[in-house]
Amino acid sequence: MMINPLIFGPLLCLVGVTDVGMAKIGDRLPSLQSIDVSHCRKLSDKGLKAVLLGCQHLRQLVIAGCRLITDNLLIALSKSCIHLEDLVAAGCNNITNAGISGLADGCHKMKSLDMSKCNKVGDPGVCKFAEVSSSSLVSLKLLDCNKVGDKSIHALAKFCHNLETLVIGGCRDVTDASIEALAFACCSRLKCLRMDWCLKITDSSLRSLLSNCKLLVAIDVGCCDQITDAAFQDMDANGFQSALRLLKISSCVRITVAGVRNVIESCMALEHLDVRSCPQVTRQSCEQAGLQFPGSCKVNFEGSLSESDPSVDIFF
């Protein structure tokens, strides 16, 4: 197997590769800065280590869906690839707090980490990672990491003031206390926050976010059934106009047309509004109330909550 590093340059993207294939690549590509082996389900720590040992300039590693990957790979990364900035390990559910902590020991310049659906990752690992990454961390995705709670969010608020994107959908132990702390600490940077299915979140969190985070462009509180119209009251106080472009409030059963009116009057830049499965907010009820949505705003009244919209997904 002959591989010319001039062909691949700084980027290597492989499909269906195994440990044997990675071993043949070995250390022949020392200039690699980005490796994408997502969903290579036969690839394990052993195969990737063979390449990583020679990639001291690696900046990005995408291993999403590589289910055989364990903590050992993250520990190897911390020793061999200290310039790593972006790790996508979504769905690698053999990774635990030990792996995240090990990564933090050596990789101190991390800008982006995606551990979505890694259900063995919880507060101890996230807190350690937040403290070490501190001001460099811009994006953290922890979708359906159900062991993540307030301790993690408080750590982010304490150390990661440059955080722009946070995904904690499905982290059901997160409460208002930590979200409000985050809203104050990251108010000058936070742009995108996904916290659907965070069932302990109330109006208090949303009010704090909307009033403090002036750059907030996307927020998802779908299925947070304690959210009411009160979350959107006084949004236009002191003439403030929200920069919000995306609001997902699907299955927020207490929201009414009055709440939606407050949103559209204060969010003139709104491009996407998701009100699916909101029984009090229908196309008919909005028309009867005479609501005038911004001309560029797409309102989603119907459809399955499992449906994905690429124009919305880009925010998270």
Give the residues covered by each predicted segment.
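N-terminal adaptor-interaction module of cullin-RING ubiquitin ligase components
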Residues: M1-I35, R41-S44, K49-L52, T70, ...
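C-terminal capping region of solenoid repeat domains
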Residues: N4, L12, D19, D27, ...
